[in-house]
Regions:
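Conserved class I S-adenosyl-L-methionine
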Residues: 1-41, 43-52, 139-164
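Class I SAM-dependent methyltransferase SAM/SAH-binding core
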Residues: 53-98
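A short, conserved alpha-helix within the catalytic core of class I
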Residues: 116-128
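Short glycine-dipeptide loop
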Residues: 132-138
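Short alpha-helix
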Residues: 173-192
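A short acidic, Gly/Pro-enriched loop at the edge of an enzyme's catalytic core
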Residues: 97-108
Length: 207
């Protein structure tokens, strides 16, 4: 199975269940939410790449003027539209490498290692830069190399036995591939950016 097929089979629903998450992963997810609220411009226009079921934008509803979430998986977008409590939130099915939007945004997000599961990272980064052109407004969170042990346990809890671990990725028996990064590799892919640690297992890159 490809990553697209694994997500279509409902991996995200299981992964967001705290009962499946090792403590290091739960701590990262909590810290990511706090950072996001600190960094997203108040009353800003925000686009979320790989938004899943919309949890990040829904969590920011009280501080943003507009939120647009995009994801290729229509079942997640349908659930995001069902869950949204109203307000200026919009969720749509789209290819993250060719987003059908022309508006300018104050921030572009790609969170919770979504970027680390995408095949064409540079094309997606290009779209993030197009929609949020100001330096420092593209926010990407990815797993660090130190995340391998808790992620291995997490994926096992999700029914995805790990069959391969390299310096750059974990591969499971179901075909799911999730990458991890060093600061050097992040800079080689993103270019000029500010990188900060999120707990012990992840990085935030502001590009």
């Amino acid at each position: 199975m490809t990553n697209d097929q694994v997500y279509a089979a409902g991996l995200l629903n299981k992964a967001l269940d705290p009962a499946t998450q090792p403590e290091a992963i739960r701590a990262f997810l909590r810290a990511e939410e706090v950072l996001l609220r600190e960094l997203v411009p108040r009353r800003g226009r925000v686009v979320d790449f790989g938004c899943g079921m919309g949890r990040h934008l829904i969590g920011l509803l009280d501080v943003i003027a507009l939120g647009v979430g995009i994801d290729y998986e229509w079942t997640y977008i349908a659930e995001a539209n069902r869950l949204k409590p109203g307000g200026p939130l919009h969720f749509l099915v789209a290819d993250a490498t060719r987003v059908p939007l022309r508006s300018r945004f104050d921030a572009a997000l790609c969170l919770t290692n979504t970027w680390g599961t995408m095949s064409d990272k540079l094309a997606i980064l290009g779209e993030m830069r197009r929609l949020a052109p100001e330096t420092g407004t593209r926010l990407i969170t990815v797993y660090a190399s130190t995340s391998v042990a808790p992620r291995r346990q997490w994926y096992t809890n999700l029914g995805h036995e790990v069959v391969e671990i390299t310096d750059e990725h974990i591969r499971t028996s179901g075909g799911f591939v999730s990458e991890h990064f060093t600061e050097g590799r992040l800079r080689s892919l993103i270019g000029d950016c500010a990188i900060s640690a999120i707990g012990d297992v992840a990085y935030l890159a502001q590009a």
